[in-house]
Design a protein with these regions (language model features):
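Sec-dependent bacterial lipoprotein signal peptides
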Residues: 1-18
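A generic secondary-structure micro-motif detector
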Residues: 6, 62, 91, 128, ...
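Short, well-ordered coil/turn elements that cap or connect secondary structure elements
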Residues: 15, 44, 78-80, 144, ...
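Alpha-helical cap/lid subdomain in secreted, periplasmic
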Residues: 97-232
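Acidic-and-aromatic substrate-binding clefts and catalytic sites of carbohydrate-active enzymes
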Residues: 92-96
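Conserved Rossmann-like nucleotide-binding pocket used by diverse enzymes
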Residues: 16, 84-86, 150
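Bacterial signal peptide processing site
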Residues: 20-24
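Serine-esterase "nucleophile elbow" of acetyl-processing enzymes
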Residues: 28-91, 101-109
Length: 232
């Protein structure tokens, strides 16, 4: 979900020699005028909502600007709410890979974090205990950095078996209770219950319309956090 930068080069002007110049008088070479120096970018003063996730956040299969974090930003802007949504979704990421890049996320000093990881762990049949431990570590890191964490839960297709699915879903429930987090039990619930046209042909990822629905789901869940932050 880059534009090419354009640089301005100033062409040097040739200095003409004067007809009345003394013989053998050296002619000063033309020097190009210095290129203008761009102003340093100003830091965005808005508080950050970091969406720390996988391909669901990254907008897999969608055009630039169609991911659900993009949709969140549009809704917030339309409501004149001064928040900056930063999309930190990476397609294919597991919770282990999330742990490995946690420092880059906490360095943004987010006020709110939407933690949307674990789905790839489940789809790969990874041990539930390791997924739980990784999510636990990330939650602690974000909370220690001063962020309010919103946990976005996922589920799995029926062929993974009822026991594994139950234990997988329980990860999110248990961690939300342990750390007093806002929990979205199943991030894509509104998509699968409304119309399957909101899911791409792979049966996993949301369409552009589906991403807009997810954006609304997340914004509804974090509304109390947005209001609390505005009162500070």
């Amino acid at each position: 979900m880059m534009t090419a930068m354009r640089y301005l080069f100033l062409l040097p002007l040739a200095l003409a020699t004067c007809a009345c110049s003394r013989p053998h008088e050296p002619v000063e070479e033309a020097r190009p005028a210095p290129a203008p120096v761009a102003d340093a970018p100003k830091a965005d003063p808005r508080p950050v909502i970091a969406v720390f996730g996988d391909s669901i956040s990254a907008g897999y299969g969608l055009e630039a600007g169609q991911s659900f974090p993009d949709g969140m930003q549009r809704h917030l802007d339309a409501e004149h709410l001064a928040w900056h949504v930063v999309n930190l979704g990476i397609s294919g990421d597991t919770t282990e890979q999330g742990v490995a890049r946690i420092d880059s996320a906490t360095s943004l000093h987010p006020a709110i974090v939407i933690l949307e990881l674990g789905g790839n762990d489940g789809l790969r049949g990874m041990p539930v205990a390791s997924t739980r431990a990784n999510l636990d570590q990330m939650i602690l890191a974000f909370q220690n950095a001063g962020a309010k964490v919103v946990l976005a839960g996922m589920t799995l297709p029926p062929n993974y078996g009822p026991d594994y699915i139950r234990d997988f879903q329980k990860i999110y429930q248990d961690l939300a209770a342990k750390y007093h987090l806002t929990l979205i039990p199943f991030l894509m619930a509104d998509l699968v219950t409304k119309d399957l046209r909101y899911i791409q042909a792979d049966g996993i990822h949301p369409t552009a319309q589906g991403s807009e629905i997810i954006a609304g789901t997340v914004l509804k869940a974090i509304q109390p956090l947005l209001a609390a932050n505005s009162r500070k």
